[in-house]
Amino acid sequence: MDATLPSIHTALKILGPNNVSVSENTALPVIQPLDILVRVACISINHVDAKSADMSPSPGATSGTDFSGVVVAIGSDVPKESFRSTNGMKPVQIGDRVFGGVFGNNPLRRDNGAFAEYVAVPARLVWHIPGGMDFSTASTLGAAVATVGLSLFQYMQLPMPTTTSTASPDNGPFVLVYGGGTATGAMAIQVLKIAGFRPITTCSSASAGHATELGATATFDYRSPTCGAELREHTGDTLTLALDCITDTASMNICYEALGSSGGRYVALDSFPLRAHTRRSVVPDWVCTYSQFGHPIAWAAPYNLEARPEDLLTAEAWYVVAQKLIDQGLITPHPKEERLGGLAAIGEGMEAVRRGQIKGKKLVYPISNELCAAA
């Protein structure tokens, strides 16, 4: 550890189900040889942060996924690593502004999470913040970009875009994004458009305009009793791919009704209700964004997953592509609401997210006023 770094920092710790508390005497995360250490400027709250703290708490673990900040230390093997330079990415150096996501509430690594003054992250799995983007905005992107990459290019096996789309969205295959008003749904719409597909989405009327601006070729009100039938009619019974960003019985039923008579693939962002798997011609699966790190997920069932090395490989490839898209300004961040109070206020924000009180935006909390003011 660099002698100029503190030996302890402040972090938001999991105490029990839906119970978090600020600890001011926590050891800094251990920097693995291929990790970097980031001083956190801002964080944003994801649904998984609140849900996992309630459903599968890891007492003593640091909470939080999404962060932005400044690199303050690098692991011993990072300078020898050629992955980033070989793939046309800027090497990570001390002083760089970066953003990304980590596995918070991790029972196998309780010292590390985004809701803290410092966070450790693999050097391969972090993005540089482009010029003109502030820490607050950057903190909203990590989990959404990573989850969309795994969902589309690993679990749906779609071809990854290079830089910009070469296919016309007017002629590409349809892909349904259920929940286009969510952060991940909005990201999926954009990436699908860039990749040359025709994204269609379900959302509220309040989110429909934004979804269209992002690239959705059609929007449908999920509250309509004929939503599934309308989707199937619009796609001419040809829909074979559905990404469910809500994942409950109602959303799964609509996705299954929308998929064409030949069937297809249904990918959820949570463990899906088995009772809603009603068609043999549809292959269901679900994504946990933390599988991108290539380690087991030791949460309670059904969220206990073995390591998936193939997810790590896809994530590494996607991070390279996504950095180019972000640098070119092709990715629009989700709307956000910035709240004050730092780490001590995050618990209240997590509760608001858990209760479904935050819609169409992400909650952001500045952690280091010094870094945010200097940016």
Swiss-Prot record:
It catalyses: N-[(4E,6E,10S,12Z,14E)-6,10-dimethyl-3-oxohexadeca-4,6,12,14-tetraenoyl]-L-tyrosyl-[ACP] = (3E,5S)-3-[(2E,4E,8S,10E,12Z)-1-hydroxy-4,8-dimethyltetradeca-2,4,10,12-tetraen-1-ylidene]-5-[(4-hydroxyphenyl)methyl]pyrrolidine-2,4-dione + holo-[ACP] + H(+). SMART domains: PKS_ER. Pathway: Mycotoxin biosynthesis. Substrate binds at residues 143-150, 289-293. Its EC number is 1.-.-.-. Keywords: NADP, Nucleotide-binding, Oxidoreductase. InterPro entries: ADH-like_C, ADH-like_N, GroES-like_sf, NAD(P)-bd_dom_sf, PKS_ER, Trans-enoyl_RdTase-like. GO terms for molecular function: nucleotide binding; oxidoreductase activity, acting on NAD(P)H; polyketide synthase activity. Pfam families: ADH_N, ADH_zinc_N. It comes from the Eukaryota. It is an enzyme of class 1 (oxidoreductase). Belongs to the zinc-containing alcohol dehydrogenase family. Trans-enoyl reductase; part of the gene cluster that mediates the biosynthesis of ilicicolin H, a 4-hydroxy-2-pyridonealkaloid that has potent and broad antifungal activities by inhibiting the mitochondrial respiration chain. IccB collaborates with the hybrid PKS-NRPS synthetase iccA to assemble the backbone of ilicicolin H. The PKS portion of iccA and trans-acting enoyl reductase iccB work together to construct an octaketide, and two methyl groups are introduced by the MT domain of iccA during the chain assembly. Monomer. This is Trans-enoyl reductase iccB. It comes from Talaromyces variabilis.
